[in-house]
Design a protein with these regions (language model features):
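Charge-rich, well-structured scaffold segments of protease-associated domains
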Residues: 1-6, 25, 80-230, 266, ...
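N- or domain-start disorder-to-order transition segments that initiate the globular core
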Residues: 2-42
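Short, ordered beta-strand-loop transition motifs
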Residues: 16, 26-27, 38, 95-99, ...
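Residues that act as N-cap/strand-start positions at coil-to-secondary-structure junctions
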Residues: 17-18, 86, 242
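A generic structural signal for beta-strand entry/edge sites
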Residues: 21, 42, 100-102, 255-257, ...
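Short amphipathic
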Residues: 22-25, 242-250, 421-422
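M16/MPP (pitrilysin/insulinase) zinc-metallopeptidase core fold and M16-derived inactive scaffolds
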Residues: 44-106, 285-300
């Protein structure tokens, strides 16, 4: 009988293992990446194309193209496509981010012979009906209009202007009225450039038997792509910056939004693996410095978070929070104070243990399921991180010392390069 009055022992996480990834190239030059684990007869298929919102002439056009991709082909209507995927109990989506467009299918292995021909048809013969385009455009316009009224959107956008070079797509103020003028021909042109014009990188996870692999190979070897297509436009973030704060007055807002960025610059892999838990100690979890002082002790915000944003343009330490407009400057001052303390005072063994346990717990989520492992490998590909980074991160956190955290904070938490943006009911 278990004595439930006694706390169970705490087990330290160690020896995390990721299922290895295998790669091979199809006869048409497309690379397939496979993570094979026989948990159940289900698989996830992800196709990634170079080309995202920063790379195309119209980010709204790309957003509409991805939302319309499943809404009709030369052989099937939108309703028929929806019914077929639902009938076979599958989940399908198409999305885009800054530099990639993604098509994802999760399905039972036994349904693949019925679903993959439809997938190939969607990727090669989508029609983008005009009536569907009109409905999606209205929905996108309403969503973008609403988003622009939020303090979170405005502060994030304002902060980007401080570390992205002028004319970078990240800070170009697209006119949402352009959404109303996007035509079917515009959508088809983007479809031809991104989906049909670029060889995708294919990722597979699940119980990938020889039978399943044969079906997948036979399908995607018939995927025809052009030699030319959408290219990625990578413009590095600014490194030679000096601390500054920009404010945007938005009247009648209950909360103000605060975004802080510190460009990292040249950071070796070994330093990066130490900087991540250092950022966790500062503001990466509920028991972090910023949460304990700014949220719990001073009550200046409901929540605050620090993280490292890793992109193809470069790495940035980001701190995000919402607070009353009158408290925004005080929050920034306290953030700087906590950074300086982290630089000058060694953290205790108790705090280091808390950071290590939280960090390892987050790492363990990556290996929890075959699909989370696949997502990890995809994220490595999309931000240019080595595939062995998982093992290196685990090794680093087990060997991390208080001195490592102090050194990382001194080296990369450069408050002389701190860029802050505040949007809300504040004085400019």
């Amino acid at each position: 009988m278990i004595d439930r009055t006694i706390l169970p022992p705490v087990s330290e996480i160690s020896n995390l293992k990721l299922q290895p990834i295998q790669q091979f190239t199809l006869c048409n030059g497309i690379t397939m990446n496979i993570v094979n684990r026989c948990d159940a007869d289900v698989c996830k298929i992800v196709l990634l194309w170079n080309g995202g919102k920063y790379d195309v002439n119209s980010k709204y056009g790309l957003s509409l193209m991805t939302s319309l991709l499943l809404n009709g082909t030369t052989q099937h209507t939108s309703d028929q496509i929806t019914e077929l995927f639902d009938f076979y109990g599958s989940k399908v989506s198409c999305t885009c981010d800054n530099h990639f467009t993604k098509f994802s299918l999760k399905a039972l292995n036994r349904t693949l012979p019925d679903l993959l021909p439809l997938v190939l048809e969607i990727l090669q013969h989508a029609t983008f009906p005009e009536n569907e385009l009109s409905a999606k455009a209205r929905k996108l316009y309403a969503s973008e209009s609403m988003q622009r009224k939020t303090v979170q959107f405005q502060s994030a956008n304002l902060c980007k202007t401080l570390f992205f070079p002028p004319q970078h797509p990240a800070i170009t103020d697209d006119n949402i009225e352009d959404i109303k003028n996007i035509t079917q021909d515009d959508i088809i042109a983007i479809y031809n450039d991104v989906i049909k014009g670029v060889k995708p990188e294919i990722y597979l996870a699940g119980n990938i038997t020889q039978e399943v692999l044969s079906i997948l190979k036979a399908t995607f070897e018939n995927l025809q792509t052009g030699k030319a297509g959408q290219k990625q436009r990578i413009v590095p973030i600014l490194q030679d910056v000096k601390t500054q704060t920009k404010k945007l007055f938005m009247p009648n807002q209950v909360q103000s939004s605060l975004d802080i960025a510190i460009p990292i610059g040249n950071c070796s892999e070994s330093d990066y693996y130490k900087l991540r838990p250092t950022t966790v100690a500062l503001g990466g979890y509920f028991g972090s410095r910023l949460n304990k002082i700014i949220r719990e002790k001073k009550g200046l915000t409901y929540g605050i978070r620090a993280s490292i944003v890793n992109t193809l343009e470069g790495k940035v330490i980001c701190i995000n929070s919402q607070c009353a407009g009158k408290n925004a400057d005080e929050v920034i001052e306290e953030i700087i104070r906590q950074i300086n303390i982290l630089k000058t005072e060694s953290i205790s063994n108790k705090e280091l243990t808390s950071v290590r346990r939280y960090y390892l717990s987050a790492l363990s989520n990556t290996s929890e399921s075959i699909f989370s492992t696949l997502d990890y490998y995809i994220s490595c590909y999309t931000v240019g991180v080595p595939l062995n980074s998982f093992a290196e991160r685990e090794k680093t956190i087990h060997n991390l010392t208080a001195e490592d955290i102090t050194t990382a904070a001194k080296t990369y938490f450069n408050t002389n390069k701190m860029l802050a943006a505040i949007a809300g009911d504040i004085k400019e």
